């Protein structure tokens, strides 16, 4: 590990020298590549340099143990304990920083939320979840664009799909996929009984043209008039588009735009991301990587989180984390869950790495 860190530090120094050259801006593509690599390496190199600095201090304090002055010996022993603890922490941090990055982490995402069991109450909860993610996106200065939505009769969503664009969106929200369960008293409940409903969340990395190749002969397009809640027609032209990917049977419908061309473009974007998700899941099964182990089978029927309104708590069942701040969570304050899930995934990845080395 330390030989690799030395090499990375040397590479970092060389890049800094290159970036200091006056003619570096002549090649903009090379400049962007170097600044990106420099940015990626900086946390690792900075931590490694701090590690080496503490190692030097540890060595100096160990030499002081042989001093004839007992007070100096005692001070040195106390400092050694402190330094050894800090070095253990930094070594663990370096192992985390050296873990392979998920190549999808920097991508934008398609967020898909669907009402599950619970009828209209599930649709209302789906709307609450969408609002929660929109609030979080606002805090992160991300852009949210609704791609498709199917409204329920009471103001909820049977289904809603949105494109979220910004820095490292997928890396932050990728662990939100799964079944989210709510326990609360519906507004229509006269007896005050608590009902349990659910909605599924799918976080798909946005597919780019280089990620997925879709041949025209694999697609079937159908057009029809768009409709609103209850099935009433909201358009007099055939602007809604249904795209079927024949090899997989995946069907995507978009009818939010008045333009058939725009609906078609949105439908193809959603389809591409779903196909990319299938491709990624197949790779994960083959590699049995740490993220796959974290989210289980990937089956969206798997309950991952419960929102209990009467008790004001939210529990993530994957990591046994409960927060008694439900109102804040529903307002988009979900960073504590995101950080805990990310840390858990890193820990699992380290365990898997250690197992592979041992075998």
From Swiss-Prot:
Post-translational modification: Methylated by PrmC. Methylation increases the termination efficiency of RF1.
Gene Ontology terms, MF aspect: translation release factor activity, codon specific
SUPFAM superfamilies in UniProt: Release factor
Family annotation (InterPro entries): PCRF, Pep_chain_release_fac_I, Pep_chain_release_fac_I_sf, Prokaryotic/Mito_RF, RF-1
Keywords, ordered alphabetically: Cytoplasm, Methylation, Protein biosynthesis
Subcellular localization(s) per the UniProt record: Cytoplasm
Cellular component GO terms held in the UniProt record: cytoplasm
Modified residues (N5-methylglutamine): 232
Entry's family note: Belongs to the prokaryotic/mitochondrial release factor family.
Entries under HAMAP family matching the protein: Rel_fac_1
Protein name per Swiss-Prot or TrEMBL: Peptide chain release factor 1
């Amino acid at each position: 590990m330390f030989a690799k860190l030395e090499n990375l530090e040397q590479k970092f120094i060389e890049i800094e020298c290159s970036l200091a050259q006056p003619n570096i801006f002549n090649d903009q593509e090379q400049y962007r590549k170097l600044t990106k690599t420099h940015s990626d390496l900086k946390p690792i190199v900075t931590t490694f340099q701090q590690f080496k600095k503490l190692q030097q201090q540890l060595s100096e304090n160990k030499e002081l143990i042989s001093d004839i002055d007992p007070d100096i010996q005692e001070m040195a022993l106390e400092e050694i304990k402190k330094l050894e603890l800090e070095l253990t922490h930094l070594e663990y941090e370096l192992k985390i920083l050296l873990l392979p990055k998920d190549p999808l982490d920097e991508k934008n995402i398609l967020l898909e939320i669907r009402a599950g069991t619970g009828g209209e109450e599930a649709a209302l909860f789906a709307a609450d979840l969408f609002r929660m993610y929109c609030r979080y996106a606002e805090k992160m200065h991300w852009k949210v664009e609704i791609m498709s939505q199917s409204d329920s009769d009471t103001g909820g969503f049977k289904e809603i799909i949105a494109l979220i664009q910004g820095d490292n969106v997928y890396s932050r929200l990728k662990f939100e996929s799964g079944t989210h369960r709510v326990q609360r008293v519906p507004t229509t409940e006269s007896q005050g009984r608590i009902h349990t409903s659910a909605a599924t969340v799918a976080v798909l990395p946005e597919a780019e043209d280089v990620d997925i190749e879709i041949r025209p002969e694999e697609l079937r397009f159908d057009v029809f008039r768009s409709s609103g809640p209850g099935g009433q027609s909201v358009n007099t032209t055939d602007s809604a588009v249904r795209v079927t990917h024949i090899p997989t049977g995946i069907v995507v419908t978009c009818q939010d735009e008045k333009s058939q061309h725009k609906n078609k473009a949105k439908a193809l974007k959603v389809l591409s991301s779903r196909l990319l998700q299938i491709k990624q899941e197949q790779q994960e099964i083959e590699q049995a990587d740490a993220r796959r182990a974290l989210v289980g089978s990937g089956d969206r029927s798997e309950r991952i989180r419960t929102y209990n309104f009467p008790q004001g708590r939210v529990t993530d069942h994957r990591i046994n984390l409960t927060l008694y701040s439900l109102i804040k969570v529903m307002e988009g304050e979900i960073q504590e869950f995101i950080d805990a899930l990310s840390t858990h995934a890193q820990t699992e990845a380290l365990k898997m790495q250690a197992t592979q080395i041992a075998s």
